Amino acid sequence: MKIYFATGNPNKIKEANIILKDLKDVEIEQIKISYPEIQGTLEEVAEFGAKWVYNILKKPVIVEDSGFFVEALNGFPGTYSKFVQETIGNEGILKLLEGKDNRNAYFKTVIGYCDENGVRLFKGIVKGRVSEEIRSKGYGFAYDSIFIPEEEERTFAEMTTEEKSQISHRKKAFEEFKKFLLDRI
């Protein structure tokens, strides 16, 4: 079974393939197709995107939307994570948190899967905190260099993709997706 992953981000494909590697009958293939990103919750964006891409391809497709939510900033950047990363970046988030004791944050991923039977959503959350500074060993992307997951001292960007894939929000969402696929194959 081939499932197309509509994303321009090769890191997401790599992470998905690591998580789903033991499903021998499932092949995830990247398709670089852009779809309109509506303003809404992660769930609304994933559902809309999956339907939109499926209506073009007429083949099983997944889209994924993630957000980075910082408690002390009332959930900002949240659903605007990509835009905020491209504008103020990690430096801007750290600046907004200056003088704040509460550094709790979480990543949330929603995968939208669409086939001839409609859309299904799969969610994953990983809680943690925002580091005091940017910390990276060259791994990861976006907010990974400022996010320390619970029960860790390293940021996601200080972990290899394989290490991050064991605990990430994307892994949790893909594990839910994997359970769904196992029931179908």
Swiss-Prot record:
Substrate binds at residues 7-12, 66, 141-144, 164, 169-170. Optimum temperature is 80 degrees Celsius. At low temperature (30 degrees Celsius), shows about 5-fold decrease in activity compared to the maximum activity at 80 degrees Celsius. Is highly thermostable. The half-life of the protein at 95 degrees Celsius is about 200 minutes. It catalyses: XTP + H2O = XMP + diphosphate + H(+); dITP + H2O = dIMP + diphosphate + H(+); ITP + H2O = IMP + diphosphate + H(+). GO terms for biological process: nucleoside triphosphate catabolic process; nucleotide metabolic process; purine nucleoside triphosphate catabolic process. One of its GO terms (molecular function) is ribonucleoside triphosphate phosphatase activity. It comes from the Archaea. SUPFAM superfamilies: ITPase-like (SSF52972). Keywords: Hydrolase, Magnesium, Metal-binding, Nucleotide metabolism, Nucleotide-binding. Optimum pH is 10.5 with dITP as substrate. The reaction rates under neutral conditions are <30% of maximum. Transmembrane segments: none annotated. One of its GO terms (cellular component) is cytoplasm. Mg(2+) binds at residues 37, 65. The active site is at residue 65. Its cofactor is Mg(2+). Pfam families: Ham1p_like. Binds 1 Mg(2+) ion per subunit. Magnesium ions are required for optimal activity, with Mn(2+), Zn(2+) and Ni(2+) supporting <50% of the maximum rate. HAMAP family: Non_canon_purine_NTPase. Belongs to the HAM1 NTPase family. Pyrophosphatase that catalyzes the hydrolysis of nucleoside triphosphates to their monophosphate derivatives, with a high preference for the non-canonical purine nucleotides xanthosine triphosphate (XTP), deoxyinosine triphosphate (dITP) and ITP. Probably functions as a house-cleaning enzyme that removes non-canonical purine nucleotides from the nucleotide pool, thus preventing their incorporation into DNA/RNA and avoiding chromosomal lesions. Homodimer. This is dITP/XTP pyrophosphatase. It comes from Methanocaldococcus jannaschii (strain ATCC 43067 / DSM 2661 / JAL-1 / JCM 10045 / NBRC 100440). The lineage of its organism: Archaea, Methanobacteriati, Methanobacteriota, Methanomada group, Methanococci.
